[in-house]
């Protein structure tokens, strides 16, 4: 069966693209970073970890606009959380801001990027190059955050040999049989599964067997992985069902209000 899952700066910003500027900021060597001795705390709660990317995204936009200082209220609003929750989350990074002044936007961006592991580059492989796999491979947010797609794999003869533009470069879809060699060459530790449900577990087993320790799974199935392997599951249908629940609740409330009137 084919593996393709088919689903239809401070004051002045340098004269470069926002992505280039932010990459230069967050990938600066530790010795060149401001307050480089600041220690990133371990033991950050999982709930905080899930919100750090939201703060990172908001700060990237602010950095591109040249924002030097940002208050907790401003960043919280841009991230869709309460300012109290934001301050609590940032305290785990050792960042408390200055009362009446706020946070150094650039340094806070660096702190969050470092906590998320974005101050280094990561090699990623994608298995399943249908419509969804194509879209994932072409997503510019991967490259701008340090995720380099080093391999695209499928079993469909109609997909193998196809060229996909990834981060401005052409990457050829390879036969899944070549994955072990690519893994050995690139040392990729992150795998993305964009296959049908029936193929996901075997693909997961293959990835883990050849060095992947983190998996982003788009297949609608729970994967059985050994201890030490992290899996993040993205189930689009489940997310739509949750939205349907909220839509139904809103409709019920509206109906109740009209009946009262």
Enumerate the predicted regions with their spans.
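Short secondary-structure boundary segments
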Residues: 195, 218-220
């Amino acid at each position: 069966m084919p593996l393709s899952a088919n689903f239809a700066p401070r004051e002045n910003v340098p004269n470069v693209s926002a992505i280039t500027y932010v990459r230069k900021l967050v990938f600066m060597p530790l010795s060149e970073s401001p307050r480089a001795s600041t220690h990133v705390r371990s033991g950050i709660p999982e709930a905080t970890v899930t919100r750090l990317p939201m703060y990172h995204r908001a700060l990237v936009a602010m950095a591109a606009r040249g924002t030097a200082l940002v208050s907790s209220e401003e960043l919280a609003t841009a991230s869709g959380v309460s300012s109290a929750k934001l301050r609590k989350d940032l305290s785990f990074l050792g960042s408390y801001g200055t009362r009446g002044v706020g946070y150094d936007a650039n340094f806070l961006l660096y702190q969050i990027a470092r906590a998320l592991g974005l101050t280094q580059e990561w090699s990623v492989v994608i298995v399943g190059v249908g419509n969804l796999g194509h879209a994932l491979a072409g997503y510019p947010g991967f490259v701008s955050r340090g995720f380099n797609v080093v391999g695209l794999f499928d079993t469909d003869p109609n997909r193998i040999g196809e060229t996909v533009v990834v981060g401005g470069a052409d990457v050829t879809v390879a036969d899944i049989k070549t994955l072990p060699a690519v893994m050995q060459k690139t040392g990729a530790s992150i795998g993305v599964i964009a296959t049908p449900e029936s193929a996901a577990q075997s693909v997961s087993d293959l990835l883990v067997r050849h060095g992947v320790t983190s998996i982003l799974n788009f297949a609608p199935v729970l994967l059985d992985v050994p201890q030490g392997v992290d899996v993040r599951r993205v189930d689009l249908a489940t997310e739509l069902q949750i939205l349907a629940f909220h839509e139904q609740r809103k409709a019920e409330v509206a109906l109740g209000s009209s009946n009262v009137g």
